[in-house]
Amino acid sequence: RCSVFCPYGIDQAEITMIGRELLNLVGCNINWVLEPAANCFRTGNHLGIQPGGIKDMLEFMADDIEDRTGVRVDVPLNKKGADILFITPSADYFADPGTYTCMGYMMLFHEIGLNYTFSTYASEGGNFGLFTSHDMIKRLNAKIYAEAKRLGVKWILGGECGHMWRVIHQYMDTMNGPADFLMEPVSPITGTRFENARATKMVHITEFTADLIANGKLKLDPRKNDHIRLTFHDSCNPARAMGLFEEPRYIIKNACNHFFEMAEDTIREKTFCCGAGAGLGNDENMEMRMRGGMPRAMAVRDVVKKHGVNRLGCICAIDRATLTTLMDYWVPGVSVMGVHELLANALIMTGEKKRTTDLRGDEISE
């Protein structure tokens, strides 16, 4: 936010990153950053989960989807020759509410018949090298292109994550590119060419989904989200570092009937900090987290009072974890969700049974 208002256009985040790297070089860092980075380097994801664990979790999600909708979705893993490699933060596999967002991806891809694959090697979109050193950014990011080449995919699709996308948008091509073995991304469903991803060959999921909606490729019933009164938090990296303002809002407005923006000076490029990004989400920092996130919480409290908001949407895995704690402290009664969880609630799937609950098992309005 400082960078938006700085009269000299100085990117404060870059300065902070260099400061962190210098501290790391003299041996000063925190375990909440170092352990996920080490796990990712060793096993491919922050949590250190082995391939069998990832497979089990995705199959559990497929079971839950079938229970809710009556539709059995595929779980493609390490599929050679798939059109698209899908990369998402590992929190979406293992941590609520991210698991509901991941279920949303799986339902969407099944419904449109997307030829895609998950990977158990490149099983992490996030990159805690961003909070450690540029060398570690490069090492952890390299596995994405390596796996895309091994599997022989055409291009890469990325899930809802914040710092993951600063790395992809700002560093990926110069650190590990050019990815000449991949094709310029073209949606196999709509034919849309994602020219902005010409260099990285990697498309953000909200761009992909917004394009599907704009071209009439999805059947949505926003009434299935009538029990949700939503506001939206612009996550710092997708918003300020990438300019992804309209795509998530376009999805939201097509997937629910009750959407309320927070005050204009607290959203889009002027969005407030979640209070616990950049590897600061550990419990030892709890007081600082609650203080740092208070401006965002007060903006949410305002729309709760005015419009009865009960859900905070975002497109960042760290936000989904940290904002949950922030809301519990400052604005009890407001829960956090990903945009593709909202979409999945509204998605009408071919052959589905009559749905009586949303993905969380909460009853939906008739």
Identify the role of each PLM range.
Residues R1-I10, T88-Y93, A122-F131, D135, ...:
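Local cysteine-cluster metal-coordination motifs and their immediate loop/turn environment
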Residues R1-N176, D180-S187, R360-E366:
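Iron-sulfur-cluster electron-transfer modules
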Residues C2-S3, K149-K154, R229-T231, V303-N310:
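Short, surface-exposed connector motifs at secondary-structure boundaries
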Residues M106-I112, S119, A214-L218, H227-M288:
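Redox- and metal-dependent alpha/beta enzyme cores, enriched for Fe-S-associated oxidoreductases
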Residues I137-L140, K217-H233, G279-G292, K353-E366:
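A polyampholytic, Gly/Pro-enriched intrinsically disordered region
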Residues Y171-P178, I252, L323-W330:
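Short, aromatic/basic amphipathic alpha-helical patches
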Residues F181-P222, E264-E269, D328-S365:
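Short, flexible loop segments at boundaries between secondary-structure elements
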Residues M288-N310:
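A short, acidic, amphipathic alpha-helical segment used as a generic capping/interface helix at domain edges
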